[in-house]
A protein has these predicted regions:
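N-terminal beta1-alpha1 ligand-phosphate binding loop
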Residues: 4-23, 35
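Short internal beta-strands
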Residues: 28-35
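Short, aromatic/basic amphipathic alpha-helical patches
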Residues: 19-22, 41-51
Length: 138
């Protein structure tokens, strides 16, 4: 039986969604947010939702959304680049993929920050979603 997940994010970390699907996860709902389509995009997320017939919400995810996901049997919420704080609940496990090594790369522009700090390497961090941005257990 496939694990039912919800995915929250933009195109920057679309490969996370691709990997989840390739490994047998069933995406029951997608969430994204408006982007400027200059430096950040959501065209791959929206195209995927349309081609697969998956519901897509382009607004902040709310506690009502989380309750609906739980009712639909969602077993995991995965985030890969999202501008808004996600309400924390114990009803659904939640994980975020952040495009830097935490805690050093905290913030909304981690790759630019790594360059400005002169870091020689960086990476990606998976962590539990907590009340504060980029604060959950790694």
């Amino acid at each position: 039986m496939k694990k039912k997940i919800a995915y929250v994010g933009i195109d920057l970390l679309f490969p996370v969604l691709e990997a989840l699907v390739a490994n047998g996860c069933e995406v029951i709902e997608l969430f994204s947010c408006p982007t400027d389509n200059v430096t950040e995009f959501n065209t791959r997320i929206t195209s995927y939702a349309n081609s697969e017939g998956i519901p897509l919400k382009m607004e902040r995810i709310t506690e009502v959304d989380l309750a609906r996901l739980k009712e639909k049997g969602c077993q995991l919420l995965v985030c890969g680049g999202y501008y808004y704080r996600i309400p924390v609940t114990d009803a659904i496990p939640m994980v975020n993929f952040h495009p830097s090594m935490l805690p050093e790369g905290r913030g909304s522009w981690p790759m630019a920050t790594a360059l400005l700090k002169g870091l020689k390497s960086s990476g990606i961090t998976a962590h539990k979603i907590a009340k504060g941005f980029d604060e959950g257990d790694i």
